[in-house]
UniProtKB/Swiss-Prot annotation:
Regions of compositional bias (Gly residues) in chain numbering: 296-310
Natural source organism: Danio rerio (Zebrafish)
Gene3D superfamilies per record: Homeodomain-like
Region of interest: Disordered: 49-74, 149-231, 281-328
Compositional bias segments (type: Low complexity): 196-210
Keywords: DNA-binding, Homeobox, Nucleus
InterPro entries: HD, HD_metazoa, Homeobox_CS, Homeobox_NK-like, Homeodomain-like_sf
Source species taxonomy: Eukaryota, Metazoa, Chordata, Craniata, Vertebrata
Biased composition (Basic and acidic residues): 53-63
Lineage: superkingdom: Eukaryota
Pfam families in the cross-refs: Homeodomain
Subcellular location: Nucleus
Protein name in the entry: NK1 transcription factor-related protein 1
Gene Ontology biological process terms, A to Z: cell differentiation; regulation of transcription by RNA polymerase II
Amino acid sequence: MNREKVQVGDSVAPAGAGVIVVAPQDGMDDKRLAAGELPVFNCVGGRDALPAESRETSPRHEPVPAGAPPTVHRTTSFSVLDILDPNKFTSKRQTPNRTGCEFAFGAENRSDDSNHTIEHKSYQEDYDCKKTSGILKDGFVFRSDECESDFTRGNQSDSELQEDLCSEESSALTGNNDAEFGQHEDDDSISKSPDGQQTQQSSSNGQNHQVKPKRKRSGSDSKSGKPRRARTAFTYEQLVALENKFKSTRYLSVCERLNLALSLSLTETQVKIWFQNRRTKWKKQNPGADTSAPTSGGGGGNGPSNGLGGLSPLSPSPPMSGHLSMHTSYPGHTPGGLVCTTQLPFLPGHAVLSPFMLGSQTYGAPTFYAPHL
């Protein structure tokens, strides 16, 4: 009897009101609970067995709110009409339920997951199955709305979007890996290739192209830790005086350097640099002869070089330097900067003594340089 009453209540709304009248006359709470539980059982079976029939009955159930009396709704909460009343869940909770049920339905269509099945059963226990089917029907009918259309479109094309994202990420990762692999190949080829090939590859690679000029600059300035200075232009008289002084001694003391700089109107730094360059040139001409060189002079050999030795047109000939190298083991310099007279007999006969070697200050006239030309 109760099942027939429920079926009548599902089909016709006034018959449902008749069921409410019969239920209080029985005076049994168990029958009311059974009548309330029967729609859930019938709907679950009806939805699993005949989903089309449940969808067809949902539009019939929507006009019920217009004819449902509100007074009967407040009489008892266990009546059939109270459970089947759509106004019970319409005002505030229908929209999230609609989206939630639609999400559950889309999940079931996409994959038969146990979690989605449990969520769908919880919706059936909380709400009426007829109402749930009506909500699903409304979801299909009113899918033209912006929010619901976007949500359902996201649920239906979720797998496609994931595949697209995976493909894009895989392509991006492969591109990055290719670029990194290309950079590693360039680095390996640069490290294994000679200097000529490295120059060609550095023109195509920006970073290597920036590293290459640094290497060139460090190679050019390896002798000096600062930018190159302007080359000093020595006059003819200054060059002759410096050459004659270098013939007498290859290392200058502090006093000799100061006197020579003042006499030639040069700075001590210029005199020191010229002697350093001249010693370097002499060592190249006479390898192995610098071991017996005197070190009594104050000039060091670690200063910056700017290639001033190439300007000297009066470099001594190898025989002259050879004769002077025989007497380099005799340190004959005095603190006053004069050459000792004991060193004069050891000089060769063809080496004419000039006022420069005697420490004289009267060497400005060009007549003194005639014998040396």
